[in-house]
Amino acid sequence: MKQTVYTASPESQQIHVWSLNHEGMLTLVQVVDVPGQVQPMVVSPDKRYLYVGVRPEFRVLAYRIAPDDGALTFATESALPGSPTHISTDHHGRFVFVGSYNAGNVSVTRLQDGLPVELVDVVEGLDGCHSANITPDNRTLWVPALKQDRIALFTLSDDGYLAAQEPAEVNTVEGAGPRHMVFHPNQQYAYCVNELNSSVDVWQLKNPHGEIECVQTLDMMPADFSDTRWAADIHITPDGRHLYACDRTASLITVFSVSEDGSVLSVEGFQPTETQPRGFNIDHHGKYLIAAGQKSHHIAVYEIAGAQGLLTEKGRYAVGQGPMWVVVNAY
């Protein structure tokens, strides 16, 4: 299995393309100059395309991924109804979802043969919309509205339209600020990192009564931390054993172990990392974590090791200015 790491640096309008080897070392493959401030990125389910959100002209760009080395070639673009904050796809590669914090909306763009061709739906009224996350069954879109302390729930129709579910939302505690999410591989639990109080909520997707329930909230900061809380990103290993979340003020990554059924998180440790870590990701083997420092203009690679999933730095690499997003492709 080959793995490619993509990093987005909006201040220098670049995507860096890296080859990741089995020892956790990166080799630079390509630097792509992007027509705009590149921020969120996602790889298509079939691994053939990289979708990128850019501003100030709000668009999603599609790049073809070379199967031999992961290099990018521009394919097409499609307009968006707001500044892209987060981008994702459904599991079948039919739709792109874009959350816009500034516009307070989530949009659905239809894909045809892997390329964005048509804006299908836009849902407004999501103040501080920070991500759009499709459930493993491809039926429900979870959309955190950070400024409203809620996660809106939508049913995705076959033609790409979003309809409010019943219930239409779940709520966090006041002032939490839900931001990014991941799902457990067993499809029973979701985890949401809350930006404003730097906590992680564990959501049971369906309890014995058929209801969505928050079963745990865990502080992700050290006990002696007293500065402003500013959490950013969250990811889980493919085997569901380890979960990680980062805070930008403290410039650290919190390491969690996950119970076998996915219902309970335990803090295992704290890893100092690049200055102001805005985004990170985990490789497809669950062996390496790659973090981007928005203020250090570097990325760092960590090995995930042991029963606790603690991190050991393997190397750091200069990228563009203000790196914000990391994605990993395997093929």
From Swiss-Prot:
InterPro entries: 6-phosphogluconolactonase_YbhE (IPR022528), Cycloisomerase_2 (IPR050282), Lactonase_7-beta_prop (IPR019405), N2O_reductase_N (IPR011045), WD40/YVTN_repeat-like_dom_sf (IPR015943)
Pathway assigned in UniProt: Carbohydrate degradation; pentose phosphate pathway; D-ribulose 5-phosphate from D-glucose 6-phosphate (oxidative stage): step 2/3
Entry GO terms, CC: cytosol
GO biological process, any: pentose-phosphate shunt, oxidative branch
Keywords, sorted A to Z: Carbohydrate metabolism, Glucose metabolism, Hydrolase
EC number: 3.1.1.31
Catalytic activity: 6-phospho-D-glucono-1,5-lactone + H2O = 6-phospho-D-gluconate + H(+)
Pfam families linked to this entry: Lactonase
TM stretches of this protein: none
Signal sequence extent: none
Gene Ontology MF terms: 6-phosphogluconolactonase activity
HAMAP family from the UniProt entry: 6P_gluconolactonase (MF_01605)
Family named by the database record: Belongs to the cycloisomerase 2 family.
Function recorded in the entry: Catalyzes the hydrolysis of 6-phosphogluconolactone to 6-phosphogluconate.
Protein name (Swiss-Prot/TrEMBL): 6-phosphogluconolactonase
Gene name tied to this protein: pgl
